[in-house]
Curated annotation (Swiss-Prot):
One of its GO terms (molecular function) is undecaprenyl-diphosphatase activity. GO terms for biological process: cell wall organization; peptidoglycan biosynthetic process; regulation of cell shape; response to antibiotic. The keyword Transit peptide does not apply. GO terms for cellular component: plasma membrane. This is Undecaprenyl-diphosphatase. Catalyzes the dephosphorylation of undecaprenyl diphosphate (UPP). Confers resistance to bacitracin. It is a multi-pass membrane protein. Bacitracin is thought to be involved in the inhibition of peptidoglycan synthesis by sequestering undecaprenyl diphosphate, thereby reducing the pool of lipid carrier available. PANTHER family: UNDECAPRENYL-DIPHOSPHATASE. The chain crosses the membrane at residues 42-62, 82-102, 108-128, 143-163, 181-201, 221-241, 248-264. Its EC number is 3.6.1.27. Belongs to the UppP family. InterPro entries: UppP (IPR003824). It comes from Nitratidesulfovibrio vulgaris (strain DP4) (Desulfovibrio vulgaris). The gene is uppP.
């Protein structure tokens, strides 16, 4: 299989799974093993193509991000208030991630821990879906500092590889009273600062693995990741109000043993 096809397949997997509550880490592990693309360079590539997925969310929610710099009258999720909410959401995982980065890389990327994270995240989703309380927060403009910080605390669960940042923040938001669609939308927007920072940090530490000859390979993965993430987020937002997350949870339980197998053997 050519390098460009490998890059395109991995970019497609990254884009389709990064913002869905299914764990992009688990899927990239399986795909990388099937394609025979593993090791330090593969890990760096997987980090780099996340930038394509991040850019897709920036494009889709450009008006919201632009509003953070140029607030509009009667829009509360804008300007300094909007920036403050995103900072509150990013703070817990940023602090914990920086403090425990080496430990996470060394001890939480084992076959058993990633597979368990997939299963625990699935059970968490099923439990949240059993709740029947009416949501208290309906739109982004109703977001409160307490809700933003609470979602940020749940986001710390995503530091456990395999748990899924989207699962942690969407389910955490719903548990704290956010409407299903709001929890998903805010999860995508809040992903940009923390993912950009984490991706940048990892790339700075591994930039020596890049060579000019790798540029077409990385560019292919980046572009495919961008396009597939754009389509996945667009479709997910259109459907999220009419569906539950139970199918995602059962799917995670099904692939957890596969992730363990491909990582262990």
């Amino acid at each position: 299989m050519s390098d460009m096809i490998t890059a395109a397949i991995l970019g497609l997997v990254e884009g389709l799974t990064e913002f869905l509550p299914v764990s992009s880490t688990g899927h990239l592990i399986i795909t990388g093993e099937l394609l025979g693309f593993t090791g330090p360079k593969a890990a760096t590539f997987e980090v780099a193509i996340q930038l394509g997925a991040i850019l897709a969310v920036v494009v889709l929610y450009w008006d919201r991000f632009w509003g953070l710099l140029r607030p509009q009258p009667y829009v509360r999720f804008a300007g300094l208030r909007g920036i403050m909410l995103l900072l509150l959401t990013s703070l817990p995982a940023s602090v914990l991630g920086l403090a425990a980065h080496s430990t996470i890389k060394a001890h939480l990327f084992t076959p058993s821990t990633v597979a368990i994270a997939l299963a625990v995240g699935a059970i968490f989703m099923l439990l949240v879906e059993r709740r029947t309380e009416r949501p208290r927060y309906m739109t982004l403009d109703e977001m409160s500092p307490a809700l933003a910080l609470g979602i940020g605390c749940f986001q710390c669960l995503a530091l456990w590889p395999g748990f899924s940042r989207s699962a942690a923040t969407i389910m955490g938001g719903m548990l704290l009273g956010a409407r299903r669609g709001l929890a998903a939308e805010y999860s995508f927007i809040a992903a940009v600062p923390i993912m950009f920072a984490a991706t940048g940090y990892d790339l700075l530490k591994s930039w020596t693995l890049f060579t000019p000859a790798d540029l077409p390979f990385f560019a292919t993965g980046f572009v495919v990741s961008f396009l597939s993430a754009w389509a996945a987020v667009k479709l997910f937002i259109a459907l999220v109000g009419r569906m539950t997350f139970r199918p995602f949870a059962w799917y995670r339980l099904a692939i957890a043993p596969l992730v363990y197998y491909f990582m262990a053997y």
